[in-house]
């Protein structure tokens, strides 16, 4: 099987600047994920960005990069820091394909707007980035070459965030066609790059499906920019044939942060995190009785919440999904609520005998 590797023989190791945008986003990651989590993102992305620049300078390979992350492992946080690093190192335009409907597009837009402190109204008196979204057709149509030149003159990086649908992407392509692109240094982020982006036509050498065609058109307009395809399920992209203009020439792993719990933690039969509930316990719960396994689960939740609280995280949630029928949920809720309320009452009224029993139950759960 062909391996996706390249060497840096065409250029010396690039110097990476960690300037204003990098400092801002890294500080936000420190506040959100702690020093360890933020450093994990920083180290991964600085290395990824450096390798991407080396790849960009190598004329024998494409500028397509496949970024593989695990499900819900913080891929977007990594992309935030990659974007910040790009802005600090001469890139002034990022195109993001942000979902397949207005809700997902809005989530992506709001996430980057909040992270980069982008005001809703463009202010030319500072150098904060600006966002244009395919969801606002009137705004996109109003953008012309003069506006883009003013933004670049003010050192304001530009986000173009598009729904991953042909009509929406065509709006962005039409905008790019209207402007002078000679001063642009762009890169593309294709979130969930294995969904909708790939060419679904049978004869891939001559035909192109609609979304794929718009991506290819955009890449050509931007002069073959860095194209980051991001996914947790990379199989379809890895096996793209030579006809695909999205075929990656490098693959990078987005390392999950410390404490990440993914599929391998919960969906393996021999996992220590899984306890099989007996039919008898399920029937007890349906009948409104508290089975021992649910008591143990709640004790585990209480202990975990206490540890989180000690670490400064004051919000936690537990989901109990024990029956497919909604009609059974009320009985289950009453059972759990009675257990929790009794626990609270024992604490409130300092019921020492009951608290001793509960402490022993918690201790047993903790040392399992």
Residue ranges and their predicted role:
Residues 109, 118-141, 185-189, 193, ...:
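Conserved C-terminal RecA-like helicase domain
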Residues 248-335:
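Conserved interdomain linker/interface between the two RecA-like ATPase lobes of SF2 helicase motors
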């Amino acid at each position: 099987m062909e391996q996706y590797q390249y060497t840096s023989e065409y250029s010396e190791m690039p110097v990476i600047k960690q300037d204003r945008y990098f400092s801002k986003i890294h500080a936000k990651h420190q506040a959100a994920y702690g020093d360890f989590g933020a450093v994990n993102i920083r180290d991964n992305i600085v290395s990824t960005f450096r390798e991407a620049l080396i790849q960009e300078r190598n004329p024998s390979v494409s500028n397509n990069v496949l970024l593989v992350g695990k499900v819900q492992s913080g891929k977007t946080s990594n992309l935030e820091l990659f974007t910040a690093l790009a802005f600090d190192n001469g890139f002034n335009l990022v195109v993001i394909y942000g979902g397949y409907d207005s809700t997902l597009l809005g989530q992506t837009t709001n996430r980057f707007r909040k992270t980069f402190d982008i005001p809703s109204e463009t202010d030319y008196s500072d150098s904060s980035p600006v966002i244009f979204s395919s969801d606002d057709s009137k705004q996109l149509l109003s953008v012309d070459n003069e506006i883009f030149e003013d933004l670049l003159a003010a050192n304001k990086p530009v986000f173009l965030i598009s729904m991953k649908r042909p009509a929406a992407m065509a709006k962005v392509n039409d905008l790019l066609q209207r402007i002078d692109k000679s001063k642009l240094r762009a890169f593309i982020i294709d979130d969930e790059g294995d969904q909708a982006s790939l060419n679904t036509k049978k004869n891939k050498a001559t035909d192109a499906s609609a979304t794929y065609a718009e991506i290819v058109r955009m890449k050509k307009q931007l002069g073959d920019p860095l194209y980051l395809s991001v996914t947790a399920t990379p199989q379809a992209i890895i096996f793209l044939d030579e006809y695909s203009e999205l075929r990656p020439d490098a693959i990078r792993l987005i390392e999950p942060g410390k404490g990440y719990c993914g599929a391998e933690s919960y969906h393996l039969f021999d996992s220590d995190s899984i306890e099989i509930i007996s039919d008898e316990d399920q029937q007890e719960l349906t009948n409104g009785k508290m089975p021992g396994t649910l008591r143990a689960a709640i004790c585990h939740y209480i202990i975990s919440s206490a540890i989180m609280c000690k670490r400064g995280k004051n919000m936690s949630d537990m989901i109990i999904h024990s029956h497919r029928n909604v009609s059974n949920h009320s009985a289950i809720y009453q059972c759990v609520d009675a257990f929790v309320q009794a626990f609270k009452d024992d604490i409130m009224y300092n019921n020492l005998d009951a608290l001793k029993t509960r402490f022993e139950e918690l201790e047993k759960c903790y040392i399992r």
